[in-house]
């Protein structure tokens, strides 16, 4: 994959959706690939319209994730925020709930898998590399 560029987390808040976060600075027609080169989506539009073409099943070092993993997103399948499901804008670990995606799902559950997860839980996050 070459040298890494800047990344943004696929996380939504009430003031900024995950899609808006990663679209800023990203090319609309740029393919999204895993660290190992596997095509995930033709572009961001494809990702939110159809979900990932391949499971997002490697970490940022290219290490395979063997088990089903929860991933913090606060994000609906269309890339918009899941209202009141963002752990108070990702600022608290108690008294709030958030929504998660489920890795290795390739349907809408990749980002919109479950709501009401306690914010104190430790889950992964998805990151998207921005265009250079």
Q: Which positions does each model-derived feature cover?
A:
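Secreted/extracellular ectodomain signature
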Residues: 1-132
């Amino acid at each position: 994959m070459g040298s890494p560029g800047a990344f943004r987390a696929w996380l939504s808040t009430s003031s900024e959706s995950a899609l808006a976060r990663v679209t800023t600075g990203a090319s609309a027609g740029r393919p999204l690939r895993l660290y190992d080169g596997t095509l995930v989506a033709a572009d961001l539009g494809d990702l939110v319209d159809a979900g990932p073409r391949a499971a997002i099943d490697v970490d940022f070092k290219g290490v395979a994730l063997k088990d089903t993993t929860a991933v913090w997103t606060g994000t609906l399948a269309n890339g918009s925020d899941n209202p009141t499901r963002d752990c108070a804008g990702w600022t608290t670990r108690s008294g709030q709930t958030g929504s998660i995606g489920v890795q290795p799902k390739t349907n809408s559950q990749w980002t919109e898998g479950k709501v009401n997860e306690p914010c104190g839980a430790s889950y992964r996050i998805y990151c998207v590399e921005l265009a250079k």
